[in-house]
Amino acid sequence: MAIREILEVPDPRLKTVSTPVTEFDEDLRRIDVINDAAFTFMDLFAHDEPALAWRFVSAYLDGTGDHDGLRGLRPYAAYRALVRAHVALLGSGGVEAFGRYWRCLEALMAPPPAPGLWLMMGVSGSGKSTVAGLLRDALAEHGRPVVRVRSDVERKRLLGVAPTARPTLAQTAHWYGADQTRQTYDRLMTAAQSALAAGCSVVVDAASLRRTEREQMRTLAAMAGVRFHLWVCHAPQALMADRLVERERQGGDPSDAGRAVMERQLAWMEPVTADEKAGARELSNEGDLAALATQVQALLRQDLGT
């Protein structure tokens, strides 16, 4: 099997150079893409940026839908860390770089804390996605493998369109009909199940306005043997309306919801029941990001018992 070849390079010096051409070898040219993603993840993790590391993984999953690949993420990242540690000893990185990557390797090989499932609830404009992102980052800072799964992204994936694609008036009824919504929550269940099986906590970013949708996720958590947490987002109606108008103006977000959608949701949503309230966390999102982050940290400490 030829892994290295001598290539003639047409430059003024008329020299030949030896270059690896592994990528042209049929047996070696292909790699599990989660292995490549694990390289970036590992480097962020090794440089003490766990929140950025898991934010990157969530973005990768939003783009690929490869939640099953999470099973290989930590082993692949550990392998990458081992290679970096070896290279550090052989090169100029020295003891400091070796120590960084060796500690990273040890952390990746250690059994992770027990995962959990966090489900967002709230009408459009209440700040669910912002809270979900803050929660994911906070869980990562607490040393927990974690990914966020967004209903807006998974709905568009099922429809075979880009995350930021917008429906025409004729398409809206199909995209947001009862059948498509059921399929979307089924897809969220599948993605969350894959993440939990890989030892990752999951933050499910969805409206969850019907009790059946919330019970679906609670049942999944029970079947997986993990704790279920319901986080309910609130905001003043006028502020929610302003946010949605601004989001529509800026574009680029997977959510299609506008002010009219929010008003309809307020009319038909199924409030949290007395049974659900026992384990639910209520968040007030008044528009102050720092205050919201403080709330998230405080509620997460309650959930984790720290």
Regions found by a protein language model. Name each.
Residues 1-31:
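Positively charged
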Residues 33-64, 79-93:
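Active-site activation/catalytic loop segments of kinase-like enzymes and analogous catalytic loops
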Residues 86-124:
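ATP/Mg2+ or Mg2+-diphosphate-binding catalytic cores
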Residues 128:
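Conserved lysine of the Walker
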Residues 131:
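Hydrophobic positions on the alpha1 helix immediately C-terminal to the Walker A/P-loop
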Residues 136-200:
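Conserved substrate/cofactor phosphate-moiety recognition/catalytic segment
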Residues 224-244:
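Conserved phosphate-donor/acceptor-positioning beta-strand/loop module used by diverse small-molecule
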Residues 246-306:
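Small-molecule kinase domains that catalyze NTP-dependent phosphoryl transfer to phosphate-bearing small molecules
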